[in-house]
UniProtKB/Swiss-Prot annotation:
Source species: Delftia acidovorans (strain DSM 14801 / SPH-1)
Physiological role: Required for insertion of 4Fe-4S clusters.
Family annotation (NCBIfam families): iron-sulfur cluster assembly accessory protein, PRK13623.1
Quaternary state and interactors: Homodimer.
UniProt keyword terms in alphabetical order: Iron, Iron-sulfur, Metal-binding
Binding site for iron-sulfur cluster: 52, 116, 118
UniProt cofactor(s): iron-sulfur cluster
Family designation: Belongs to the HesB/IscA family.
Record's protein name: Putative iron-sulfur cluster insertion protein ErpA
Residues passing through the membrane, by range: none
Biological process per Gene Ontology, one example term: iron-sulfur cluster assembly
One Pfam family it belongs to: Fe-S_biosyn
Lineage start: Bacteria, Pseudomonadati, Pseudomonadota, Betaproteobacteria, Burkholderiales
Gene Ontology MF term list: 2 iron, 2 sulfur cluster binding; 4 iron, 4 sulfur cluster binding; iron ion binding
């Protein structure tokens, strides 16, 4: 009797880290929504072509959630990301910083191979 062993090679891929929406960013968005006086507003983060590195980030308020949007909620604040933008933002951190240079939303994106000096555009 002979035994035949079958060896199968499996490749496992790690699930990408979801997008991190920091407490600081959620708190600032909550403040901005309160100023607008419209509790139905959500922060939409998107990626579009442009900037000196090829892609740039955008932020806007939106009342409508589209079918292809990914929705994240933090401390009662909703963040919307469309499907095309999501693929560029997987693993990113969306934060809000205040320092001597001013106050701004900041995206730390591990998918960006290069960024411009101002940090608002990137390439992959």
């Amino acid at each position: 009797m002979s035994a035949v062993a079958e060896i199968t090679e499996t490749t496992t891929t790690e699930m990408p880290t979801p997008i991190v929406f920091t407490d600081s960013a959620a708190a600032k968005v909550a403040d901005l929504i309160a100023e607008e006086g419209n509790p139905d507003l959500k922060l939409r983060v998107f990626v579009q072509g442009g900037g000196c590195s090829g892609f740039q980030y955008g932020f806007t308020f939106d009342e409508i959630t589209n079918d292809d949007d990914t929705t994240m909620t933090k401390n009662g604040v909703s963040l919307l990301i469309d499907a095309m933008s999501y693929q560029y933002l997987v693993g990113a951190e969306i934060d809000y910083k205040e320092d001597l240079q001013g106050a701004q939303f900041v995206i730390k994106n591990p998918n960006a191979s290069t960024t411009c000096g101002c940090g608002s555009s990137f390439s992959v």
